[in-house]
Regions:
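Alpha-helical transmembrane segments and adjacent TM-loop junctions that form the membrane-embedded core
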Residues: 1-113
């Protein structure tokens, strides 16, 4: 009965789009935090899709970074997460510039003033 209950609970979590366990989300935060330049990870959403995991997040980095540099950081983060969670993991990273005084800083605007 205990084994059947465990299977039912696990499957219900998948069917109801439940987040992955806290220790798994901590692993994700640790992996992302190891990437140089990451200021903050927020809006982390995780779930299981069949035998794969889905990881969506917002990451704050230096706003003066080029698109090429941001893409390189995303590639490193995605590779590290796939090493941990498997090659079929769905990973979506949304980059945002670091906020100062509650607002996004625009480095180009500041340079031209």
């Amino acid at each position: 009965i205990k084994a059947a209950y465990s299977l039912i609970v696990q499957n219900m979590k998948e069917l109801t789009d439940a987040s992955l366990p806290e220790n798994i989300e901590k692993d994700i935060k640790d992996i992302v935090g190891m990437e140089q330049g990451v200021s903050e990870l927020h809006n982390l959403r995780t779930r299981r899709i069949g035998n794969a995991v889905s990881i969506e997040m917002h990451v704050r980095m230096d706003g003066s970074m080029s698109l090429y540099e941001a893409h390189a950081h995303a590639t490193v983060i995605e590779h590290s997460l796939r090493e941990r969670f498997g090659g079929n993991a769905y990973i979506n990273i949304h980059f945002e510039p670091i906020k100062k005084n509650g607002k996004y800083e625009n480095p180009k605007k500041e340079r031209h003033q």
